[in-house]
């Protein structure tokens, strides 16, 4: 069961994660200047024609549309609700589970005047779920639903999160690191005036929600083990024997829901086929300003890494095997190196940067959504009825959407009962909520499973997984499935993201679409989507040649200059007359003036200067070739450059960004690390 913290111990963090990747204290969300400078209903974003057709909206800056104006407009429509004068509705709602879904629903119901009581099992959200699952991705659709529920709470969540939706995200080949398909999660949000996707510490999110719900609503150390529905009231029984009575019960007690079991009997969760290792590392990649998250694809395994702010990266490593596996003590990191041997530097480097103690493992389960979510005065929401695989990052988002829809449906039913003078029909209201959510949840649940199937069947080259024919892999022939998959995914992905992120926005009553200047993406975003070369040139780290091989210990790293008039000369002796840097390598196969490395427009080139034994490059797809003399050849991150053929001067190209020292000991960094 997901759970929350004891309310009395809550102190909501004021630390936010901005694109600087340093924790910065935020001003109060109620600060007038904060609103006027950061939230505007029309922004100066100009979005080119999208890949899925149709003209993207041109949104111009207009200072007349500050958030205060939006609030004033909503005051006209919903004066009582915005002013906080919500008439109390004589309907008592019991909620089993104080995880994200349970707390969001409790907040939504409380805001609409209902009497809510949340029963929470223990502190597993901090010690268990929060520890195992780390920061959570809250996507645009869920953030918009939060805004429709409580704008002040939503602003705290927005301020505490690290924006990832304003950068490149997508799928890459796990071995080469080359882009397979890029995701645009920015445009679908801005087109509909939705907040841009963020990641936030799970603990921080639950603290914000619990503080808003209130101490008087949450009862900790209270595990709902049974209930009775007599048609007029529902009574719940806790594991300590206490009973409570209400007008309806909402089961938000997670994938192992006791409410679900009591409703429909025992049913096994569905094993996804994957075990998952996860961790958080003090690590900042060189493309942190241009890439939010990546999914690295492989055959029967895949790896996900995401910026979570504060100089940290969160990662998940999925591996197809039977459930219940156990690693050797302190052996998880080594097993990851074994599983992902030969994969690209982006995967290996973040594993290297992760402490063994920070790595956790769990098997991944989901539940097939039921056509019937409840009976009588009892219903379910979130993982208790449609637990999803984490591949789309929509599990928690769907719970938030569920919460909004259920609170809205009950509110409308109450208003109808007041107008008609008849008692509220709770059972019919719950059925209406279930019907409104069933299709959307079912489709997204299916897409999450489909994403896992894609990862299972992905093969970069012909010969992978073919046993005796595996030698074909060395020929580097693109696998037909890889080619065909890209042909399908490229046009389908924008449509899918547009529906996932924006498909629920029209149901959010009273929410006024707006854009935030603080979420403005780079002017180069569109170019990065279209041009991998431009994305590489945007790297902000230091280009370095790192020695590798058996004699690496006798060589020193070579740090390359970005200045075009400062070349690096590689040779057997120092060249004092060089306008840049001179590196002397002691090897019989290194010519006196062997090669030259130059930078032009952010790209690096190596030129063999007519050396006897040549200069060689092995690229990220394993192709090895000798450079033609006196002809500049571009090289890329992860390429291997060899001067001569005796393996005594071999270097790997790395682009490294050092995480800020301030982030390592900051309170926010500590929160993320323990999450």
Swiss-Prot record:
Q: Which pathway does this chain act in?
A: Plant hormone biosynthesis; abscisate biosynthesis
Q: Which residues form a coiled coil?
A: none
Q: Which GO terms describe its cellular component?
A: chloroplast thylakoid membrane
| The protein's required cofactors | FAD
Main EC class the enzyme belongs to: oxidoreductase
Q: Which InterPro entries match?
A: FAD-bd, FAD/NAD-bd_sf, FHA_dom, SMAD_FHA_dom_sf, Zeaxanthin_epoxidase
Q: How is its activity regulated?
A: Inhibited by diphenyleneiodonium (DPI).
Q: Which cysteines are joined by disulfide bonds?
A: none
Catalysed reaction(s) here are: all-trans-zeaxanthin + 4 reduced [2Fe-2S]-[ferredoxin] + 2 O2 + 4 H(+) = all-trans-violaxanthin + 4 oxidized [2Fe-2S]-[ferredoxin] + 2 H2O
- Keywords annotated in UniProt: Abscisic acid biosynthesis, Chloroplast, FAD, Flavoprotein, Membrane, Oxidoreductase, Plastid, Thylakoid, Transit peptide
Q: Where is the transit peptide?
A: 1-25
Protein localization: Plastid, Chloroplast thylakoid membrane
What is written in the cofactor note of this entry? FAD enhances the epoxidase activity while other flavins such as FMN or riboflavin are without effects.
Fetch the Gene3D superfamilies from UniProt. 2.60.200.20, FAD/NAD(P)-binding domain (3.50.50.60)
Annotated EC: 1.14.15.21
Q: GO molecular-function annotation terms? A: FAD binding; zeaxanthin epoxidase activity
Which residues does FAD bind? 92-120, 370-383
Q: Which residues form the FHA domain?
A: 558-622
Entry function:
Converts zeaxanthin into antheraxanthin and subsequently violaxanthin. Involved in the epoxidation of zeaxanthin.
Q: What is this protein called?
A: Zeaxanthin epoxidase, chloroplastic
Organism, per UniProt?
Spinacia oleracea (Spinach)
């Amino acid at each position: 069961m997901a759970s929350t913290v004891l309310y009395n111990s809550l102190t909501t963090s004021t630390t936010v994660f901005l694109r600087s990747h340093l924790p910065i204290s935020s001003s109060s969300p109620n600060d007038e200047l904060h609103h006027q400078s950061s939230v505007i209903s029309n922004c100066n974003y100009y979005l080119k024609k999208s890949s899925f057709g149709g003209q993207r909206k041109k949104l111009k800056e207009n200072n007349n549309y500050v958030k205060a104006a939006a609030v004033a407009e909503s005051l006209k429509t919903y004066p009582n609700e915005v002013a906080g004068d919500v008439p109390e509705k004589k309907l008592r709602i019991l909620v089993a589970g104080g995880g994200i879904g349970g707390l969001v629903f409790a907040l939504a119901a409380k805001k609409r005047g209902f009497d809510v009581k949340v029963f929470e099992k223990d502190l597993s959200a901090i010690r268990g779920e929060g520890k195992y699952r780390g920061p959570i991705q809250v996507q645009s659709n869920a953030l918009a639903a939060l805004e429709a529920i409580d704008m002040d709470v939503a602003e705290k969540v927005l301020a505490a999160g690290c924006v990832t939706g304003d950068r490149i995200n997508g799928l890459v080949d796990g071995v080469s690191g080359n882009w397979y398909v890029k995701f645009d999660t920015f445009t679908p949000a801005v087109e509909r005036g939705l907040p841009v996707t963020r990641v936030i510490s799970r603990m921080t999110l639950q603290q914000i929600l619990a503080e808003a719900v209130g101490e008087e609503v949450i009862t900790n150390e209270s595990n709902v083990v049974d209930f009775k529905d007599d048609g007029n009231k529902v009574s719940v029984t806790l594991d300590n024997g206490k009973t409570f009575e209400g007008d309806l019960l909402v089961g938000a007690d997670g994938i192992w829901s006791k409410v679900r079991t009591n409703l429909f009997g025992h049913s096994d969760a569905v094993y996804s086929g994957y075990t998952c290792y996860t961790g958080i590392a003090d690590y900042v990649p060189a493309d942190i300003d241009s890439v939010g998250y990546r999914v690295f694809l492989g055959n029967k395994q895949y790896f996900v890494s995401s910026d979570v702010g504060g100089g940290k990266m969160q990662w998940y490593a999925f591996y197809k095997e039977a459930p219940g596996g156990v690693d050797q003590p302190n052996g998880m990191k080594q097993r990851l190196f074994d599983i992902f041997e030969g994969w690209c530097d982006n995967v290996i480097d973040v594993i290297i940067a992760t402490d063994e103690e920070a790595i956790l493992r769990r098997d991944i389960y989901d539940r097939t959504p039921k056509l019937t979510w409840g009976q009588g005065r009892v219903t379910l929401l979130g993982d208790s009825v449609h637990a999803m695989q984490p591949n789309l990052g929509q599990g928690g988002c769907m719970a938030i959407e569920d919460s909004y829809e259920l609170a809205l449906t009950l509110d409308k039913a109450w208003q109808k009962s007041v107008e008609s003078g008849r008692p509220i029909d709770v059972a019919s209201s719950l059925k209406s909520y279930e019907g409104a959510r069933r299709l959307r949840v079912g489709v997204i649940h299916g897409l999450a499973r489909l994403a896992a199937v894609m990862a299972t069947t992905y093969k970069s080259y012909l010969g992978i997984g073919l046993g005796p024919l595996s030698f074909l892999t060395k020929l580097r022939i693109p696998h037909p499935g890889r080619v065909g998959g890209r042909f399908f995914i490229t046009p389908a992905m924008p449509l899918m993201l547009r529906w996932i992120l924006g498909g629920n926005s029209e149901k959010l009553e009273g929410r006024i679409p707006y854009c935030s200047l603080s979420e403005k993406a780079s002017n180069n975003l569109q170019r990065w989507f279209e041009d991998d070369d431009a994305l590489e040139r945007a790297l902000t780290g230091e280009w370095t040649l790192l020695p590798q091989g058996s004699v690496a210990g006798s060589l020193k790293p070579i740090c390359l200059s970005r200045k075009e008039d400062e070349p690096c000369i590689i040779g057997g002796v120092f060249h004092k007359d060089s306008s840049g840097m001179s590196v002397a390598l002691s090897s019989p196969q290194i010519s006196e003036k062997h090669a030259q490395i130059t930078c032009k427009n952010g790209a690096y080139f190596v030129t063999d200067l007519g050396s006897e034994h040549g200069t060689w490059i092995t690229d990220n797809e394993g192709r090895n070739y000798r450079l033609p003399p006196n002809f500049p050849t571009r090289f890329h991150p992860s390429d291997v450059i060899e001067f001569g053929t005796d393996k005594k001067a071999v270097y790997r190209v790395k682009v490294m960004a050092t995480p800020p020292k301030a982030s390592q000991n900051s309170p926010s960094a500590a929160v993320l690390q323990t999450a």
